[in-house]
A protein has these predicted regions:
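N-terminal, polar/charged subdomain of small-to-medium soluble alpha/beta proteins
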Residues: 1-102
Length: 102
């Protein structure tokens, strides 16, 4: 599984990147049935006129004949990432079940 990061107004140290990769590692259980090619992670920090700094995390996972896409915002980067991983995990599980039931 190949992971690419795209960052805007955010810096990731190796510890945070390692935590993110560890959380994405459980997606590998769907690797055999879905054959993930690439995972793109976009992380940006923007200013909201009422909320202040807002982090936006977008995860795109390329699987054959389908693109799994999740976008999540939050006041904390890791919290938004955790919610996005939960959503992409649910999508991957549903896609795996759909492929298995063919």
């Amino acid at each position: 599984m190949q992971i690419q990061y795209y960052l805007k107004n955010v810096e990731l140290d190796s510890g945070v990147k390692e935590k993110m990769e560890k959380k994405l590692a459980h997606l590998s259980k769907y690797q055999k049935s879905l054959n993930f090619m690439k995972i793109h992670i976009d992380i940006s920090r923007d200013r909201h006129h009422r909320k202040g700094d807002v982090y936006r995390v977008e995860i795109n996972a390329d699987v054959p004949r389908k693109l799994l896409r999740v976008e999540q915002t939050g006041p904390d980067m890791l919290a938004a990432f955790d919610l996005a991983v939960e959503k992409i995990d649910r999508q991957a599980r549903e896609e795996k079940d759909r492929v298995a039931n063919r």
